[in-house]
């Protein structure tokens, strides 16, 4: 399964937005600059988050994005589905029906074994993403990123937050 690069961008941006003080916003420009991303493409990912009600937006000189609810109430699956959509990662086209050896009128009563395995794997993947909260990511990053870099990053962010 290959996810759009915007999924990675959205996850990282949400982790940064989780650190904003109440009532502050961060612009697309600042988020793009922080992550070295093209602003126009990042904007599309952020709009997807907004349409999914994961972030709030405001216009104007101090406008931008902030989380719409606490990071403990947003999971990875919420973010992935906001960018990628909610469709299953595997679509069965039932090619077994094309088998020339199949008797006329033969009908299978259950999905094929391939589809069942793929759907089970998809559900396991979604359950894993569902269990990981944005607040978990922030906690992991705060432990793994050197303290000086973590602090300087948020100082940089706060200077640009509206």
Where are these regions (language model features)?
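Key DNA-contact positions within bacterial/archaeal DNA-binding proteins
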Residues: 40
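A short alpha-helical element within helix-turn-helix/winged-helix DNA-binding domains
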Residues: 29-36
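Helix-turn-helix DNA-binding elements, focusing on the entry/boundary residues of the two helices
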Residues: 28, 46
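C-terminal regulatory/oligomerization modules of transcriptional regulators
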Residues: 92-162
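Beta-hairpin "wing" of winged helix-turn-helix
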Residues: 53-62, 66-68
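Short alpha-helical segments that sit at the start of domains
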Residues: 1-14
């Amino acid at each position: 399964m290959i996810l759009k690069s915007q999924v990675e961008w959205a996850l990282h941006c949400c982790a940064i937005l989780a650190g904003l003080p109440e009532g502050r916003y961060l612009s697309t420009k600042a988020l793009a600059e922080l992550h070295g991303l093209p602003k126009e493409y990042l904007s599309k990912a952020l709009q997807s988050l907004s349409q999914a009600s994961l972030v709030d937006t405001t216009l104007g000189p101090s406008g931008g994005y902030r989380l719409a609810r606490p990071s403990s109430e947003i999971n990875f699956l919420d973010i992935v589905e906001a960018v990628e959509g909610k469709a299953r990662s595997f679509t069965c086209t039932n090619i077994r029906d094309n088998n020339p050896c199949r008797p006329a009128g033969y009908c299978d009563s259950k999905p094929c074994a391939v589809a069942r395995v793929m759907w089970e794997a998809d559900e396991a993947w979604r359950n894993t993403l569902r269990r990981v909260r944005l607040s978990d990511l922030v906690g992991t990053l705060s432990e793994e990123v050197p303290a000086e870099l973590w602090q300087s990053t948020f100082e940089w962010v706060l200077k640009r937050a509206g």
